[in-house]
Amino acid sequence: MTLQAQLLPGTLDLLILRAVSLGPLHGYGILLRIGQISGNALLIEQGALYPGLFRLVRQGLLKASWGTSDNNRRAKFYELTAAGRKRLREETESWNRLATAIGAALGEQPEEA
């Protein structure tokens, strides 16, 4: 099951930052990397990705530059800035605290009769 339509607000930005933290990537490479690091559980649509990339560049969290892709096509590559690295660290810590709190709140579920 893919969770593409069930991402919480802000989660896409975090996933993009995480994907790019592993090295500069073009848009399609970011889509593939998110799929890879999530075990293909998270599949992001291009229509959602590119507005997120533009937003992160405007915020100074990503830097974009033109380069050549593996198939010799011109592509825009994205990489983390120092501010992006800091935001990724902060948001990852926040996400981990939230996931722990939700896990504790849900606790063990009683078996259905």
Regions inferred by a protein language model and the residue ranges of each:
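Amphipathic alpha-helical dimerization/coiled-coil segments
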Residues: 86-113
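Basic amphipathic alpha-helical segments that dock to polyanions
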Residues: 49-56
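Beta-hairpin "wing" of winged helix-turn-helix
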Residues: 57-74, 79
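N-terminal helix-turn-helix DNA-binding core of bacterial DNA-binding proteins
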Residues: 5-48
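Short, structured helix-loop boundary elements
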Residues: 46, 74-77, 92, 99
